[in-house]
UniProtKB/Swiss-Prot annotation:
Species per Swiss-Prot/TrEMBL record: Hypocrea jecorina (strain QM6a) (Trichoderma reesei)
One example GO MF annotation: iron ion binding
Gene3D superfamilies: Cytochrome P450
Pfam families the UniProt entry points to: p450
Signal peptide coordinates: none
Name assigned to this protein: Cytochrome P450 monooxygenase iliC
Amino acid sequence: MVYSQLQALKRNYYLDWLRNLHKGKPKTFAITFMGVKQICTIEGENLKAIQATNFKDFGLEPMRRKTKGAMPFADKGISTTDGKNWEFARFLVKPFFYREVYASIDRVDPYVRKLFGLLPEEDGVTFDIQPLIQRWFLDLTSEFIFGKTMDSMTYPDRANITWTMLDVLRGGRLRIQMYKFLWAFNWNWWLKAVYEVHDFVNVHIRSTYKELAAREQRIRDGLPVGPERVDLLWYMATHVRDEEELRSQLCLVFVPNNDTTSIFISNCIWHLARDHEAWQKLRKEVLDYGDQPITFESLRSMPYLNGVLNETHRLTPNNIVQVRACLNDSVLPLGGGPDGKSPLYVNKGDLVSVTKTVMYRDPDIWGPDVDVFRPERFFGVRGNWNFLPFGGGPRRCPAQMMVQTESAYMLFQLAKRYSRLECRDPEPYTAVMRIGPSNINGVKIAFYK
């Protein structure tokens, strides 16, 4: 099984591999993976148990920190720890929850306008929009995290760190999954990428510490100081004064976060380009809105726009599998008994894996057209544990509202600007695994005004 999984990742059929793993089996079943019992499930109630009702019984640290799978890239951070260490890491990302950040259209708009300046001026020109969206998001997120944009849309070479971070993520995923064989996954290319990212982040950390020390000295001397920085690094640096610890905390936010929204928006466009009717419905909703000011609330009130976002999350979720280690003997509400409807006992040390890419295509939940892109299926649907793209409970993704706002605004402006969107790549979606699935051929399209 280890070999088949590695081959699936290497040859870019990992999503099919996961679906085949579940094919013909109950909705909750157990396997043995590298000598550890792993409970695989697509039951929303079981996801609720590990993320909310029995939250304290399940965690990440045994898989990610104690195994040293993420080292030397990072040690303590929001995605590697449990308990008090996790609570502190969660506290350090508090700026993600500031409404003035996640609800701000003014923060996003200048970057969207700049991206539009890079799109082909003539109608019908074939191009790949995915790398442009990656540069757009790098510029947007670097301002929020470091207080200064990288401006890779003006200087494309500055986006090279993005590809380095992708190497870190790809290697890190394998090392964490195959933690018992770390000696076989200590590649020079991965270590080189890790140290390049460290060098990049260290420059920002040291500059911030220097600026912070100068500010604190002026305050002690009774001298005036200017407005305080409001970026994430500044906030973190005021609470963590050890450079190595701060780098670990920051890397576990910056590196995974750098890939999420750009992949998601690219996937949205990939689906829309293959559905002329969906693009026209989205455009009609946008044009019907008129010239009113666009706000966080107005974006959230558009049913078709949000249906597009949710349907993209469903068909191509960024978080395809959520795995938790059982920290204390516990119980899942479903999976036991002959019919799988009774509680299931979980021993300390077992793993529970919720395969979202299979759950989100379960005909019992979504009907017979599970493989069809149909945003209307979300009209009037309230959130539930069968569909939580950003997770739930205390470990819900802190960037949820920010991702939704940035993505909705980008699609709104594209639909307003272009009357037609055409697919220029007939090949099916072939997922390369990064932080989430990304199409191997990019997103080749053409716009018409």
